[in-house]
């Protein structure tokens, strides 16, 4: 009888035992309502990693001008997406899946420009008595404008909590992982849906950056180019030919010189071909994928009478991506 009671106690203890390690997925965020569009834009253009003006007063002034010039247009975009960004609900669904697949850790997320902010999430983790943290950048390639900005925000939030000092590890890039690239390639093939790949120009579209950011030492362009070369190698290994495989940059803002070629330019250049686009710099769908690529550029493709225009979804909350994240975390070396 004592043995049975002991086993029951062990089962109860295991069932109620809380994870001591948390994995925080870091991303830019997106408006959770039309009201939050202004909050999102204000926070983004007040970020010194985005608007690299050293003088705080000047940065805030220029940022306010940009926000005022873009807010109504941005609201119309989010109206077409159902009144909010899809990024937060998809990320929530991903963490739900992660927690079911790996109950030994607690998976959550923090956004850079909209709630839940890192400060809010870390306060909650402190109450949960978490002993170890993994900050996981949801951007496959590293950039000061995304990865570094998110890490800086998360570490500053952590420093502000004087009594919460967990062990911290980071995952700052993962584009070179073959498992990831196999998932990407499968996503492309699923989108083709038995169409002949050799009939299509495959465009890997990534978020653009001002050339000045790259000239200052940001490795983003180099990593995007390397990522495409790795995917090309994988396609050759698996004998999956495309008419052409190209890299392009989207979402240019303002009069500055940005990375080229633009996605629009490549769509127009290959107007006589079938086109399939994969959003290589994003893991979660957002306005740049669902509106810009799938609505705005689709209209452009229709005007150009392009034979066929396909847009691949991001990895989102797929079980394949969730298992990939868990694998990265489990294989992360202690520092």
Swiss-Prot record:
Is the Cytoplasm keyword given for this protein?
A: yes
Q: Which family does it belong to?
A: Belongs to the ferrochelatase family.
Q: Which reaction does it catalyse?
A: heme b + 2 H(+) = protoporphyrin IX + Fe(2+)
Q: Name one GO biological process term.
A: heme biosynthetic process
Q: Which UniProt keywords apply?
A: Cytoplasm, Heme biosynthesis, Iron, Lyase, Metal-binding, Porphyrin biosynthesis
Q: What class of enzyme is it?
A: lyase
Might you report a single GO cellular component term? cytoplasm
GO terms (molecular function) for this protein are: ferrochelatase activity; metal ion binding
Query: Would you tell me the protein name for this molecule?
Result: Ferrochelatase
**Residues annotated as binding Fe cation:** 207, 288
The record's annotation in HAMAP family points to:
Ferrochelatase
The enzyme's E.C. designation: 4.98.1.1
Q: Known CDD domains for this protein?
A: Ferrochelatase_C (cd00419), Ferrochelatase_N (cd03411)
Predominant localisation class: cytoplasm
Name the pathway.
Porphyrin-containing compound metabolism; protoheme biosynthesis; protoheme from protoporphyrin-IX: step 1/1
Function of this protein? Catalyzes the ferrous insertion into protoporphyrin IX.
Gene for this chain: hemH
């Amino acid at each position: 009888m004592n043995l049975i009671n002991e086993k029951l106690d062990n089962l109860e203890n295991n069932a109620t035992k809380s994870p001591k390690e948390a994995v925080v997925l870091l991303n830019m965020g997106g408006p959770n309502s039309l009201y939050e569009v202004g909050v999102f834009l204000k926070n983004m253009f007040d970020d010194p990693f985005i608007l690299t003006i050293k003088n705080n007063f000047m940065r805030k002034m220029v940022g306010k001008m940009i926000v005022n010039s873009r807010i109504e247009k941005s609201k119309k975009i989010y109206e077409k997406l159902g009144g909010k960004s899809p990024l937060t609900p998809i990320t929530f669904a991903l963490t739900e899946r992660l927690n079911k697949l790996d109950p030994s850790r607690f998976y959550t997320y923090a956004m850079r420009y909209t709630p839940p902010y890192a400060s809010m999430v870390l306060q909650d983790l402190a109450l949960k008595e978490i002993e170890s943290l993994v900050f996981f950048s949801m951007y496959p390639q590293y950039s000061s404008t995304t990865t570094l900005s998110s890490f800086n925000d998360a570490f500053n939030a952590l420093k502000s909590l004087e009594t919460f000092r967990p062990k911290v590890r980071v995952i700052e890039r993962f584009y070179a992982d073959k498992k990831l690239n196999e998932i990407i390639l499968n996503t492309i093939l699923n989108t083709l849906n038995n169409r002949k790949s050799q009939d299509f120009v495959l465009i890997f579209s990534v978020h653009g950056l001002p050339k000045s950011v790259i000239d200052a030492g940001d490795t983003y362009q180099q990593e995007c180019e390397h990522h495409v070369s790795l995917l090309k190698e994988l396609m050759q290994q698996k004998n999956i030919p495309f008419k052409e495989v190209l890299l392009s940059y989207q979402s240019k803002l303002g009069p500055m010189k940005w990375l080229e070629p633009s996605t629009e330019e490549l769509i127009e250049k290959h107007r006589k071909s079938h086109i399939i686009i994969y959003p290589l710099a994003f893991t979660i769908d957002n306005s740049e994928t669902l509106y810009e690529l799938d609505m705005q550029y689709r209209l452009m493709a229709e005007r150009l009478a392009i034979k066929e225009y396909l847009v691949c979804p991001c990895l989102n909350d797929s079980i394949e991506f969730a298992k990939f994240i868990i694998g990265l975390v489990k294989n992360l070396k202690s520092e």
